């Protein structure tokens, strides 16, 4: 009986933890808090991930996935002149990030 109760409590805790993770992961991003840039000819998401790596501290593949998801891009390809939000907080940009707004 006691073992069953322990399993029930443990299962409930794990379920709540997983559910909280899904809710947090699906929370919308407030784009106003992040830097918006204008894509220059020849820019790639991989190149932007490397260019801004000191400001976002994400692996390049995570940076690319974030940009594609938040900007609702149909593919990871960028077009010159396109404006995209990148995972660099405006409050953290200091003087080191060149921002095109």
Curated annotation (Swiss-Prot):
Database matches in InterPro entries: Cell_div_suppressor_YneA, LysM_dom, LysM_dom_sf
UniProt keyword Cell division present: yes
Main location: cytoplasm
GO cellular component: cytoplasm
GO biological process: division septum assembly; DNA repair; negative regulation of cell division; SOS response
LysM domain segment(s): 35-86
Alphabetic keyword roster: Cell cycle, Cell division, Cytoplasm, DNA damage, DNA repair, Septation, SOS response
A Pfam family of this chain: LysM
Localization per Swiss-Prot or TrEMBL: Cytoplasm
Range of residues in the leader sequence: none
CDD domains xref list: LysM
Family the entry assigns: Belongs to the YneA family.
Job description of the protein: Inhibits cell division during the SOS response. Affects a later stage of the cell division protein assembly, after the assembly of the Z ring, by probably suppressing recruitment of FtsL and/or DivIC to the division machinery.
Protein name: Cell division suppressor protein YneA
